[in-house]
Amino acid sequence: MGNSETSCIWNSEESFFDDYHASRVLPGFAPDSKLRMLLQMADQAEILIAINAADIEKNKVRHDLGITYDEDVLRLIQEFRDKGLYVGSVVITQYSGQSGADQFKTKLEHRDIKVYRHYCIEGYPSNVPLIVSDEGYGKNDYIETTRPLVIITAPGPGSGKMATCLSQLYHENKRGIKAGYAKFETFPIWNLPLKHPVNLAYEAATADLNDVNMIDPYHLEAYGVTTVNYNRDVDIFPVLNAIFEGIYGESPYKSPTDMGVNMAGFCIMDDEACCEASKQEIIRRYYHALNRLAKEEGTSDEVYKINLLMNKAKIDSTMRGVIAPCLERAKVSGGPAAAMELNDGTIVTGKTSSLLGASAALLLNAIKVLGDIPHNIHLIAPSAIEPIQTLK
């Protein structure tokens, strides 16, 4: 690092490009809001992408995009570059000689992308004396950076973003470079109540990770102020504090909440709108969890947890306008059905037939409504569909 001072900002799993969860629960929040903010500091910022070697080895998939984590790293690099942001390097975390990680490293280097490796540390994260030593973080590659603001992001959770930040702080400090660390994530919103629908919606979104929102006891003790954080940050804070003390001599933070730079709670102008949007999101997540369970991608615990969150928010599935019409259409037709709410509030449904699935029928019916086309008009002639059905 050529500068006398650098800052590491740890980004959460939330996306810079398409944070649709935030846009759903905070009406008016653009999916790329964080990217726009970052672009204002583009000349000072450097992107570092972390990926876990184990995720490369097992071809872990981002289900929202249908691509593996290593493919997503390549996508992120191109996305950032297309936006005019500088991607400095990729760090492969928890490396222990995995062949898949070696192949990926070679692929990146052939594209002139710098690659660093961080290794497994025995007893991590509780063995602080070993972690903060030449045999712990000291074994990791020192990541050469050239700009004062380093943003560490990743394809998804468990990629090692926080550990990468702490390792880098250790190495910078050893080189006499003053470096800081902050957490850049939107949820949970620390200055909203624990059971506020926006924060409950975050729990629903992370039901598969078993995240739980809780009062930050360290912040309450230090400042006498009630704030909200999630269990993983609260549980790990004593360890982080000890690591910071090992690096700096003293910790700059008195609580997990202190580590964040989230000001979203101060931007809410219509709390009622956010509450309603968040309740709708919890219901949506409930059905998403049921779908994952049916496809054997999720667990019943995930469904039970979101159902409990619905009880906490005092809501049920009937509060989502498309549910009742969809169930009624399925009951009447005797097969799978689908429903959609248009921008003007109109509910459109579609049923399963010998020619079309429910989703295809729904889309065609929605086009008819939007185009004011009589329902008995065929947008696609049955004779055009039948050969496809025969082929299938």
Go through each PLM region and give its residues.
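Flexible phosphate-sensing "switch/lid" loops adjacent to ATP/NTP-binding sites
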Residues: 1-153, 168-327, 342-344
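The conserved Walker
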Residues: 156-157
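Hydrophobic positions on the alpha1 helix immediately C-terminal to the Walker A/P-loop
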Residues: 164
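Amphipathic alpha-helical regulatory segments at dimerization interfaces
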Residues: 328-329, 369
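Short, small/polar residue-rich loop motifs at catalytic or cofactor-binding pockets
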Residues: 332-336
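Cytosolic beta-strand hydrophobic patch enriched in CBS
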Residues: 337-341
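Zn2+-dependent cytidine deaminase-like catalytic core
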Residues: 349-392
